[in-house]
Design a protein with these regions (language model features):
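A conserved short beta-strand
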Residues: 127-138
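Gly/Ala-rich beta-loop-alpha elbow adjacent to hydrolase catalytic centers
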Residues: 110-114, 118
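Conserved alpha/beta-hydrolase "acid-adjacent" motif
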Residues: 169-175
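Short beta-strand immediately N-terminal to the catalytic nucleophile in serine-hydrolase-like folds
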Residues: 108-110, 134, 163
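Serine-hydrolase catalytic machinery in alpha/beta-hydrolase-like enzymes
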Residues: 4-101, 148-149, 202-207
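Short beta-strand/loop motif that positions the catalytic acidic residue
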Residues: 156, 162-164
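C-terminal catalytic histidine-bearing segment of alpha/beta-hydrolase fold enzymes
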Residues: 184-242
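Alpha/beta-hydrolase fold nucleophile elbow
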Residues: 99-111
Length: 242
């Protein structure tokens, strides 16, 4: 079951698309950081799929602070890392407050700009026990005046699974290799998968120009076991994030 809900973050209403497993009361959670178009049909589908796999899945609308006008790049350009961190934290706290549920470990995945968000959060909050980065661009660029996600690599607290298309320009394979080397440098557990016949947004089935069925299926089929290995169901009480 999946539906829209709404919370308030820093005085601004933020919508969330929430997928709830149909069985049980105790389960891990996965935050789904959306791609440039926002929480659209593709992101909703990923939330629903994760819920069917037994995860409480939540996709927050990271654009909630800004007006809807502007193209994708303009809207991405308005995002600020401190605000994004606050939004993701609010989504985790929302999961922890849900009635009749017992929350286990929390992971995060993201696509395109959301892949960058997943990398950022892996370094920003130790609450996350796993991060899935799907063709995350601009990991080496800041949103605002703070450090880049790349600069924060020493503070990463969880294993990362990355999925990248060899034909992508952002991130390019050179970018991917540089990020992997940085993770190696700081001995951060990661597995990176590169697909030679895919470019950016190769999982997005709503875009025939970029979708690649084979790589998309393979990447998702690798993500689910990764989450199963890293996220556990727990009955221990959790503290609210600040």
């Amino acid at each position: 079951m999946a539906q829209w809900d709404q919370i308030t973050v820093d005085g601004s209403p933020m919508r969330l698309y929430v997928g709830m497993p149909s069985l049980g009361r105790a389960f891990p959670a996965v935050i789904v950081a959306h791609h440039g178009p926002g929480v659209d049909k593709f992101i909703e589908d990923r939330v629903e799929h994760l819920a069917r796999q037994g995860y409480l899945a939540i996709a927050p609308d990271l654009y909630h602070r800004q007006a809807e006008e502007g193209d994708v790049l303009t809207r991405i350009g308005r995002l600020q890392d401190p605000e994004v961190i606050a939004d993701v934290n609010a989504a985790v706290n929302y999961a922890r407050r849900l009635k009749d549920t017992q929350l286990g470990d929390v992971g995060i995945i993201g696509f395109c700009m959301g892949g960058r968000v997943a990398y950022l959060m892996a370094a920003s909050k130790p609450v996350f026990k796993a991060a899935g980065v799907f063709y995350g661009g601009n990991i080496m660029k800041p949103w605002g005046n703070g450090p880049t996600p790349f600069d924060l690599t020493p503070y990463i607290h969880c294993p990362i699974a990355g999925f990248f298309g060899a034909e992508d320009a952002n991130p390019s394979l050179e970018d991917v290799d540089r990020i992997s080397a940085q993770l190696d440098r700081y001995r951060k557990a990661h597995e990176f998968h590169r697909y030679p016949d895919a470019g950016h947004a190769f999982l997005n089935f709503t875009n025939p120009a970029t979708y690649r069925e084979g790589p998309a299926r393979d990447a998702w089929d690798k993500l689910i076991p990764f989450l199963q290995r890293t996220l556990q169901t727990s009955r221990q009480p959790r503290q609210r994030l600040s």
